[in-house]
Amino acid sequence: MEQNILNSILDKFGDGDQERSDIRHNDSGDENDNHSDHEGNHGNNECCEGNEDGDKEYEVDVEDMTDEQYAQFIQEQQEPKIKSGGNTGVKGVLSDYAEHREKQKQKYLQKKYETQKMLEKMCFTTRDQPPPTEEENQLDSDDDDLERIRKARMEQWKSKQQITSDVKKPEKKVFGYFKQIDSSQYIHEIDNEPPNVFVIIHLFQNYIPECVLLNQQLGQLAVKYRYIKFLKILSKEAKENYHDEALPSLLVYIGGKLLVSFVPLTEELGRNFDQEDLELLLSSYDIIPNPMKAKNSNWETSLSRKRPESDDDNDD
């Protein structure tokens, strides 16, 4: 009886030990298994973190993506933040992307507008080109048309100035300097002046003798005619593909618009021009007073002062 009871107890506890042994054999211990699982997960996390670092270092070209691809890309980049924080969703990402695209578009349009505005202000005649070919020489009639348009524009401007002066003569702004500018200042220097101010700009290169000569003369005119704004700019700075054959170029603006352009100036004055030649040319467009009239006026004034003395001598 006792043996039967003992065998029953051994069988009972033996099965239980085997089950626990099997559990420990399969699980290798609860604490160790949990620790192994934790290390495995930690290894996976490190791997993911490594991938994230790799993704950060790799620059993705988003310009070629569609809106949906870009939204998915942004969502993947922000996925850890979305899990831990608020979820912006695809609509939020698309909204941010649309705002980014709009800013880029506005920036591009602004740059395009400024470039176009500068080119409009530098609308030279057809002489701002390389030496003409035989076919181009047959287009002389076009130059005549341009000359007629230029004269008509001058007459229109003169009549407008006459009307303005009859109503009210605005105060003149004083300059008295000859300043060099760059392309970023070009439009600003022309537009930000009163409508009655002439702005004369010389496009030049230092290795061209006529440009050096003109710079010397313009520097003297800037002191003599202080109500005119005299500027100079390197031709390649103003226009990248500007031809040296068109130098020296002299442009005259008033009221923010191109009044007349001499491109090149040597076609009007030749290569051995002096300051008086330049003044006569500018005075022919009423930009400055005629220097010959001023000389004649001074001569007549001087002569009139001497006449009474000569008359008195004759009477004696």
From Swiss-Prot:
InterPro entries: Phosducin (IPR001200), Phosducin-like_chap/apop_reg (IPR051498), Phosducin_N_dom_sf (IPR023196), Phosducin_thioredoxin-like_dom (IPR024253), Thioredoxin-like_sf (IPR036249). CDD domains: Phd_like_Phd. Keywords: Chaperone, Chemotaxis, Coiled coil, Cytoplasm, Sensory transduction. It is found in: Cytoplasm. Residues 1-61, 293-316 are annotated as: Disordered. GO terms for cellular component: cytoplasm; cytosol. One of its GO terms (biological process) is regulation of G protein-coupled receptor signaling pathway. Residues 102-156 form a coiled coil. Residues 12-41 have a biased composition (Basic and acidic residues). Residues 49-61 have a biased composition (Acidic residues). GO terms for molecular function: protein carrier chaperone. Its main location: cytoplasm. Residues 175-316 are annotated as: Thioredoxin fold. Residues 95-290 form the Phosducin domain. Belongs to the phosducin family. Required for normal chemotaxis in response to cAMP and folate. Required for the heterodimerization of the G protein beta and gamma subunits gpbA and gpgA, which is itself thought to be necessary for prenylation of the gamma subunit gpgA and its association with plasma membranes. This is Phosducin-like protein 1. It comes from Dictyostelium discoideum (Social amoeba). The gene is phlp1.
